[in-house]
Amino acid sequence: MDIRSHIRTVPDFPKPGILFYDISTLLAHAEAWKATVEKLAEAVAPHKPDLLVGIESRGFLVAAPLSLALGCGFAMVRKKGKLPGQTIRYTYDLEYGTDTVEIQADAIAPGQRVVVLDDLLATGGTMAAAIHLLRSVGADVTAAAFIMELAFLNGRDRLDVPAEVLISYES
């Protein structure tokens, strides 16, 4: 199954000059989505995760079905103020400002093997922040995984774990 053919590109979204890779068309095609989850399962299984963590919001769509396929738990990293109860947060720098990610304080047991997922690897900033946050609560982050990456942005350079990617766009 050619997963790439099920990902729509939208020029000038969310602003002029940006080419947006939209997975809505992939999600809408049951066989293509199933094949995507199966391929991710093959890539992630060797990292032996106890728990998958999805990054808000499309990372949830990737991590949740994959956790069922691999028989492991699922937790969420969200933007500040979106999770109930006690949370642990990490604030990181963006090109023009800062952002904050959070996880529930009891979401991860110390030493749990974790793979972090998102739909797209671009600059790597959000994933690097999520990995930092997860380690601060005791996770053993063994890998990051994505449906696709914009390889020309060199996001892998910001990660200190293996990055599993199904589709790489070179330009």
UniProtKB/Swiss-Prot annotation:
It is found in: Cytoplasm. GO terms for biological process: adenine salvage; AMP salvage; purine ribonucleoside salvage. It comes from the Bacteria. It catalyses: AMP + diphosphate = 5-phospho-alpha-D-ribose 1-diphosphate + adenine. Its EC number is 2.4.2.7. It is an enzyme of class 2 (transferase). The keyword Glycosyltransferase applies. Pathway: Purine metabolism; AMP biosynthesis via salvage pathway; AMP from adenine: step 1/1. Belongs to the purine/pyrimidine phosphoribosyltransferase family. Catalyzes a salvage reaction resulting in the formation of AMP, that is energically less costly than de novo synthesis. This is Adenine phosphoribosyltransferase. It comes from Rhodospirillum centenum (strain ATCC 51521 / SW).
